[in-house]
């Protein structure tokens, strides 16, 4: 008889993996759609220069999504084959291959469950950062812009989740 605990863990992992892969694949589309609805997202995108490239990845898997800002201010997905292999992503070093795309900033989640919790609205980026759910590589100024952009994006997408709802305001007592 199979151990049902490991079977459930396997199914849960596969469901989380499918969800995270789908969101990584859809990331440029989501950014491009939500930038039209949010001035905050637009402001952070405007801070990033055309050609700026960032990557979200999940340790222990081959899951990664790489996006590059266009001259028009939208983001396009970068296929894995086009990413520079001769320099560390987020290092700021140029590639010796002029056709390769160098990654300017990397957000690397420690594990699939951490990525899933962030991508599903189960916890905010601030909470995830507090528990060291991800590490980053790249310049701090653009990292802050990406963090603000993702916070606004996730709040719009998951505003109904407890992690993103505003704390209840204290009610005044009638005197």
Q: Whereabouts are the PLM-identified features?
A:
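Feature captures hydrophobic
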Residues: 1-175
């Amino acid at each position: 008889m199979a151990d049902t605990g490991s079977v459930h863990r396997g199914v849960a992992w596969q469901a989380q993996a499918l969800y995270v892969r789908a969101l990584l694949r859809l990331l440029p589309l989501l950014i491009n759609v939500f930038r039209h609805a949010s001035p905050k997202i637009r402001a952070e995108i405007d801070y990033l220069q055309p050609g700026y490239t960032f990557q979200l990845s999940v340790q222990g898997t081959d899951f990664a999504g790489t996006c590059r800002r266009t001259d028009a201010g939208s983001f396009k997905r970068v296929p894995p084959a086009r990413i520079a292999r001769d320099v560390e992503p987020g290092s700021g070093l140029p590639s010796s291959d002029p056709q390769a795309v160098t990654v300017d900033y990397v957000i690397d989640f420690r594990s699939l469950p951490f990525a899933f919790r962030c991508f599903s609205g189960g916890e905010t980026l601030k909470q995830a950062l507090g528990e060291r759910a991800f590490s980053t590589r790249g310049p701090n100024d653009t990292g802050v812009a990406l963090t603000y952009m993702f916070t606004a994006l996730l709040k719009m997408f998951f505003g109904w989740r407890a992690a993103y709802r505003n704390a209840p305001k204290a009610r005044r007592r009638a005197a």
